[in-house]
């Protein structure tokens, strides 16, 4: 069957989900029947077609009244502020991809369900009372038919969780720290301007800016045994896409750097193929733009100190990789629900 999807919020992730759907050749498995976005439809069409990070969309895009066309596919455009007013029942929506970045509670998910959707997938970390939080490639096999309201976690969680799992399974992690080196985001300023976070009052293109992160909480959600044993900090840097994560962990078993690299390389070629990639090429962040993997391990940067302290550098396209995981998780939810 083809999964009927509606997208709520057509920003960076929402638009990349549509692009990834068509570029990955999964149009026969998923069809987008509606997009709810407060912006005007002409602007939606323009930004879907032309993207500073990802270039021109290869498919023809046009807008006619309340419809957006991708090739010959018609997508209904909505501008509803109230979740309860969305016509999901009328449109026969199987899964809503809520890509607003605003909603993430069970109450918000239930509002989509009340409007007629069968399932909801948030594109960001949700509240603890959701039915499941999925990092595809790690725990999607835990999805059940009764799971209606699900979170796909965050781009950085999807990047680092597979690597942590691999290192923990192999060597036994005792504790760790994470530094996220993240591209600038829409909540920063072009030039100095007011913001509740005084660091984010400053021009995004001119500074490396420390910001708060809940990544440590995201890690312990998947690995409760690491509660109070993982810490994370984050900085935003003057690039518009691609993120690097510096992961340091202390492990129980002694290990060498080449052994760590071999472990991660084999995982990329085997059980985590398509989710984790591995490289030893002398690449920089822009080289990972439009990469569909959740994580790309940079083997040239792996270090081991005292046989028990491992440091790795992991890259991800925080937009494109995550958008592809949204599609993977959507299909996983539909598979368990509708088989």
Swiss-Prot record:
Organism domain of life: Bacteria
Active site per UniProt: 155 (nucleophile)
Q: Give GO MF terms, alphabetically.
A: erythrose-4-phosphate dehydrogenase activity; glyceraldehyde-3-phosphate dehydrogenase (NAD+) (phosphorylating) activity; NAD binding
Its EC number(s): 1.2.1.72
Q: Where is this site: Activates thiol group during catalysis?
A: 182
- Subcellular locations according to the entry: Cytoplasm
Explain the activity's dependence on pH.
Answer: Optimum pH is about 8.6.
Indicate whether Oxidoreductase appears among the record's keywords: yes
In this chain, substrate is annotated as bound at: 154-156, 200, 213-214, 236
Task: List residues binding NAD(+).
Answer: 12-13, 81, 318
Report the catalytic activity. D-erythrose 4-phosphate + NAD(+) + H2O = 4-phospho-D-erythronate + NADH + 2 H(+)
Q: What does the UniProt keyword field contain?
A: Cytoplasm, NAD, Oxidoreductase, Pyridoxine biosynthesis
The record's Gene Ontology biological-process terms are: glucose metabolic process; pyridoxal phosphate biosynthetic process; pyridoxine biosynthetic process
Pathway annotation from the record: Cofactor biosynthesis; pyridoxine 5'-phosphate biosynthesis; pyridoxine 5'-phosphate from D-erythrose 4-phosphate: step 1/5
Query: Temperature annotation for this entry?
Result: Optimum temperature is 50 degrees Celsius at pH 8.6. Relatively thermostable. Activity begins to decrease significantly when E4PDH is incubated at 50 degrees Celsius for 5 minutes.
Q: Which GO terms describe its cellular component?
A: cytosol
State if NAD is listed as a keyword. yes
- UniProt record similarity statement: Belongs to the glyceraldehyde-3-phosphate dehydrogenase family. Epd subfamily.
Q: What does this protein do?
A: Catalyzes the NAD-dependent conversion of D-erythrose 4-phosphate to 4-phosphoerythronate.
Subunit notes for this chain? Answer: Homotetramer.
Q: Which PANTHER family match?
A: GLYCERALDEHYDE-3-PHOSPHATE DEHYDROGENASE 2
- Protein's name in the database: D-erythrose-4-phosphate dehydrogenase
What organism is recorded for this protein? Escherichia coli (strain K12)
Lineage here is: Bacteria, Pseudomonadati, Pseudomonadota, Gammaproteobacteria, Enterobacterales
């Amino acid at each position: 069957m083809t999964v009927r999807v509606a997208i709520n919020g057509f920003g960076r992730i929402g638009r990349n989900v549509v692009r990834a759907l068509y570029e990955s050749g999964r149009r026969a498995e998923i069809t987008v029947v509606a997009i709810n976005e407060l912006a005007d439809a002409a602007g939606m069409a323009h930004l879907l077609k032309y993207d500073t990070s990802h270039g021109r969309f290869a498919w023809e895009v046009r807008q006619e009244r309340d419809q957006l066309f991708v090739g010959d596919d018609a997508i209904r455009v909505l501008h509803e502020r109230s979740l309860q007013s969305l016509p999901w029942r009328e449109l026969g929506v199987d899964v809503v991809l809520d890509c607003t970045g605003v909603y993430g509670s069970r109450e918000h998910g239930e509002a989509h369900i009340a409007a007629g959707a069968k399932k909801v997938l948030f594109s960001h970390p949700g509240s603890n009372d959701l039915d499941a939080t999925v990092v595809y490639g790690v725990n999607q096999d835990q999805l059940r038919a009764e799971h209606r309201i699900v979170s796909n976690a965050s781009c950085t969680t999807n990047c680092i969780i597979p690597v942590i799992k691999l290192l923990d399974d192999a060597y036994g992690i005792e504790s760790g720290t994470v530094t996220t080196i993240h591209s600038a985001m829409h909540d920063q300023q072009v030039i100095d301007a007011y913001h509740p976070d005084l660091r984010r009052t400053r021009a995004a293109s001119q500074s490396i800016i420390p910001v708060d992160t809940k990544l440590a909480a995201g890690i312990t959600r998947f690995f409760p045994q690491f509660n109070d044993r993982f810490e994370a900090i984050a900085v935003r840097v003057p690039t518009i896409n691609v993120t690097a994560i510096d992961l340091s962990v202390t492990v129980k078993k002694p290990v060498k750097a080449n052994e760590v690299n071999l472990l991660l390389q084999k995982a990329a070629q085997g059980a985590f193929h398509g989710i984790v990639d591995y490289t030893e090429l002398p690449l920089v962040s822009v080289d990972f733009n439009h990469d569909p993997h959740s994580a790309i391990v940079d083997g040239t940067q792996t270090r081991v100190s005292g046989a028990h302290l491992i440091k790795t550098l992991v890259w991800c396209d925080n937009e494109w990789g995550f958008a592809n995981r949204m599609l993977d998780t959507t299909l996983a939810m539909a598979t368990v629900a509708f088989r």
